[in-house]
Every structure is written in structure tokens, then in C-alpha cells.
UniProtKB/Swiss-Prot annotation:
Name recorded for this polypeptide: Tryptase beta-2
EC class of the enzyme, as a word: hydrolase
Tree of life domain: Eukaryota
Organism in which the protein naturally occurs: Homo sapiens (Human)
Role, per record: Tryptase is the major neutral protease present in mast cells and is secreted upon the coupled activation-degranulation response of this cell type. May play a role in innate immunity.
PROSITE patterns, A to Z: TRYPSIN_DOM, TRYPSIN_HIS, TRYPSIN_SER
Lineage: Eukaryota, Metazoa, Chordata, Craniata, Vertebrata
Protein localization: Secreted
Length: 275
């Protein structure tokens, strides 16, 4: 089944910058059809940086506890990256302009992760020190296990990724936001089978995944690992983690996210429920 799925999805792409490892061609990178985020919004958004000629943004993430960041496994695994070459930047309006990079003490990749398309595309980063929570920087709320995020619910995805297929976010690199509707998994799966070489009995969109977006609005390369959030009864809940898709805002190819409720037990094995 694994080989069948990998062979059947040759053009899907995960949404992270930098050369992907074998089988990781599907990661996501940017916001298509969105606009610059207001400075007062999305205080849990973080940027993951890797040391190159400078500390380069390569993925997003979310602050779920003063000392823990939630991101996509394909950003930091399956082989754990060198901690010395990894940093976290908390919420900033423009990349690189007021960096205060934080070191990471531990990377935990879900043990079942192999590629984003197979699932379990989720990872945790433990910061060396807890951050000071403020109105500008604070945690996002994880959903209760019972939350389903029904089809059509308007949600938001944020990041500093590409603004279109193969079109990088230009300076001054503002944080972007876009509203996307939730889509039922079985409808999303049917859409991904259109024009694909997979049989209808092969599940492309799995139970631990969540679909959102349309042909005008989507996440894209560079947004990988970032949060998909939905407002439920006045509280922003993180429904998903940007994972993969085919192109960005393409017909019949919604964005695919790791479903956070599916992994709550795993998350709370490491992350305290209360700071």
C-alpha cells in the first residue's frame, strides 16, 4: 500500500522550503489569495529557522505552551535535525526585521511519521526556556477531542510562505493570512482521485488529516507546520497543522492538514495541559 500511494502521487508537494528528502515532495510553503495579517492577530504564530548564510525561515509552527511549539514532522524529520542549526522566532510582523531567535532543546517527531502523505505529520519542539506570554505573544488553544470542525466552517491559515505556485513572498516578508473553508474528508479524497492513477479503494486523505481551501485560497510552500485555526464559541482552536497538497489553490486539490484532535493524546504525553 505504501509503495502504491507513493507511486500514485508523483506531483504532490509538502509545503516546506529547502530540498525535500526522498518521498517528501508534497510539503506546503505559502499563503495564496490572502492578505497581510493585522499586527494584533495570530500571537501564537512562529517561524522555524535553519542556519545557512543567515537564519533562514523554512517552516511555520504554533506556540501551544510557553515552552512547546507544534509543527509538521516533515519540517524536522524523519531524521531529527541538528539542534544547534535550528531556532524558533516568535510572532513578528515581518521576517528578519526584529529577530530574537530562541534555541530548541528537544525535537520530538511522531514515531509513525514517514512522509506527509502517509500521515502522522506532526512534531513537537521544546524550547530551552519558557517564553514570556503577553498580548503580542501567547499560546493557541488545542481543541477538545470531541470537536469535529464541520464542513463549511470558515477557518484561517497563516504563514510567510509562497504567495502563488513558485512565487516567493517578497520583501518586507509580511505575515499573511487567508480564510479557508473546511471540507469533508470523503469529498476531499474524491477530488484528489480525479486525474490520479490511484484506485478508488486507495485512501489518499486519511482519518488523521483535515482538508480546507478552494481554488482561490490556500496555503502553499513555506507555510508547512503552521496553524489552521477556527473560532468556536469565541475561542480560537487549532484544528490543523499545514501538511501537504498538490500545488497551491489548484482545482480539485484542497490543502491537507494534520488533524490535531487525532493526536491530542500524543501531544499531551509530552506537553502539560496547563502551563
Amino acid at each position: 500500500m505504501l509503495n502504491l500511494l507513493l507511486l500514485a502521487l508523483p506531483v504532490l508537494a509538502s509545503r516546506a522550503y529547502a530540498a525535500p528528502a526522498p518521498g517528501q515532495a508534497l510539503q506546503r510553503v505559502g499563503i495564496v489569495g490572502g492578505q497581510e495579517a493585522p499586527r494584533s492577530k495570530w500571537p501564537w504564530q512562529v517561524s522555524l529557522r535553519v542556519r545557512d548564510r543567515y537564519w533562514m525561515h523554512f517552516c511555520g509552527g504554533s506556540l501551544i505552551h510557553p515552552q512547546w511549539v507544534l509543527t509538521a514532522a516533515h519540517c524536522v524529520g524523519p531524521d531529527v535535525k541538528d539542534l544547534a542549526a535550528l531556532r524558533v522566532q516568535l510572532r513578528e510582523q515581518h521576517l528578519y526585521y526584529q529577530d530574537q531567535l530562541l534555541p530548541v532543546s528537544r525535537i520530538i517527531v511522531h514515531p509513525q511519521f514517514y512522509t506527509a502523505q502517509i500521515g502522522a505529520d506532526i512534531a513537537l519542539l521544546e524550547l530551552e526556556e519558557p517564553v514570556n506570554v503577553s498580548s503580542h505573544v501567547h499560546t493557541v488553544t488545542l481543541p477538545p477531542a470531541s470537536e469535529t470542525f464541520p464542513p463549511g466552517m470558515p477557518c484561517w491559515v497563516t504563514g510567510w510562505g509562497d504567495v502563488d505556485n513558485d512565487e516567493r513572498l517578497p520583501p518586507p516578508f509580511p505575515l499573511k493570512q487567508v480564510k479557508v473553508p473546511i471540507m469533508e474528508n470523503h469529498i476531499c479524497d474524491a477530488k484528489y482521485h480525479l486525474g490520479a492513477y490511484t484506485g478508488d479503494d486507495v485512501r489518499i486523505v486519511r482519518d488523521d488529516m483535515l482538508c480546507a481551501g478552494n481554488t482561490r485560497r490556500d496555503s502553499c510552500q513555506g507555510d508547512s507546520g503552521g496553524p489552521l485555526v477556527c473560532k468556536v464559541n469565541g475561542t480560537w482552536l487549532q484544528a490543523g497543522v499545514v501538511s501537504w497538497g498538490e500545488g497551491c489553490a489548484q482545482p480539485n486539490r484542497p490543502g491537507i492538514y494534520t488533524r490535531v484532535t487525532y493526536y491530542l493524546d500524543w501531544i499531551h504525553h509530552y506537553v502539560p495541559k496547563k502551563p
